[in-house]
């Protein structure tokens, strides 16, 4: 399903009441490159709540650790990808790790870490955008401009960040 909030579109797939896949908030012209489906005109309250939380993550208005307490989700990924994403979940708001940092922890290559991150079905909720290359931003499925935007928002909000109560 795709839910529109203001000018943003957020794709989500649920199994039962658990979120198993989402997109970051995108413009109408971008969303269908990342998710098939129709825009739901009257989403269920629970689905709308999840979309609103994802939008807050995009603008760095809430910490992903808090979100993982608010949203029921399930990771359906291969074991290695899960190990990578478990490390990524621990990267603090406003901070980054390199692909190499994670690779050392798992005794693997930075390229393998990058491939695992590309499989992250829950971007923003599991903050793969916080993983960068040694001397650059690295890659991001949604484009480096969006990765840079999210990281800049997090750094700006980190100094005076007060976690707003969400629902």
From Swiss-Prot:
Coiled coil: none
Active site: 128 (nucleophile)
EC number(s) stated in the UniProt entry for this protein: 2.1.1.63
Gene Ontology terms describing biological process: DNA alkylation repair; DNA repair; methylation
Keyword DNA damage in annotation: yes
Localization, UniProt: Cytoplasm
Keywords: Cytoplasm, DNA damage, DNA repair, Methyltransferase, Transferase
Described function: Involved in the cellular defense against the biological effects of O6-methylguanine (O6-MeG) and O4-methylthymine (O4-MeT) in DNA. Repairs the methylated nucleobase in DNA by stoichiometrically transferring the methyl group to a cysteine residue in the enzyme. This is a suicide reaction: the enzyme is irreversibly inactivated.
Extra remark: This enzyme catalyzes only one turnover and therefore is not strictly catalytic. According to one definition, an enzyme is a biocatalyst that acts repeatedly and over many reaction cycles.
Protein name per UniProt: Methylated-DNA--protein-cysteine methyltransferase
Gene from which this protein is expressed: ogt
């Amino acid at each position: 399903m795709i839910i529109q909030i203001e000018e943003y579109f957020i794709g989500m797939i649920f199994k039962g009441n658990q979120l198993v896949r989402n997109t970051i908030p995108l413009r109408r012209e971008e969303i269908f490159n990342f998710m098939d489906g129709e825009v739901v005109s009257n989403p269920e309250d629970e689905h709308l709540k999840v979309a609103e939380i994802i939008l807050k993550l995009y603008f760095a208005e809430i910490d992903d650790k808090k979100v993982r307490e608010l949203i029921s989700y399930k990771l359906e990924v291969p074991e290695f990808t899960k190990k990578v994403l478990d490390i990524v979940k621990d990267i603090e708001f406003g901070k980054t790790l390199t692909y190499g940092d994670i690779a050392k922890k798992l005794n693997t290559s930075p390229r393998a870490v990058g491939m695992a991150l590309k499989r992250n079905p829950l971007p923003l909720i599991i903050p793969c955008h916080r993983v960068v290359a040694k001397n650059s931003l690295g890659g991001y499925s949604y484009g480096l401009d969006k990765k840079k935007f999210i990281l800049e928002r997090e750094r700006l909000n980190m100094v005076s960040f007060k976690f707003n109560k969400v629902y």
